[in-house]
Amino acid sequence: AARYAFLRGTYTRGKPFKAEVSGSDKRFCFLLPPKKESKRLAVYEAAIETLAHLTLEETADKWRLSLGGIYAPKEGESTRSSSFKASPALEAFLSGRPEIEEIEICTNNDYAGRWAAEHIAKFYQSRYQIILNLPEKEGCDYADLAKEKYEERAARQREACSR
């Protein structure tokens, strides 16, 4: 039985529609296992970014976990590190996987994603090796990059077929 569900609308009339299904438990967010044993866990803001990054890397060599969203203060607000709260999904996963040695942080490359990445790194750096792996383009996430790669490949195929 499903323990966690996230809703997202595609036709939003200019406003994003995102919500969790009532009764969802964030300890059980979207998780992709590796094909072989792995000591690395990659964490993402959402399931779509988890799948997009897997598509871009073309390898299932590590655990991949969606955090079910992140918290970050609004840009420009003064914040204290104490406002950071560990992700229930990440805490639940790590408590059941003592073999994990590395956390690869793959949040979005926007203010919220960078803020979350910095605070996740600080929170876990004493227990795990931390790898920051944000998308190289400012303002992007891995779904944006996967879409861009797909569109480039489709354009090349159309060009090749029109010759």
What do the PLM-derived regions correspond to, one by one?
Residues 1-96:
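Phosphate-handling DNA/RNA-contact segment within nucleic-acid enzymes
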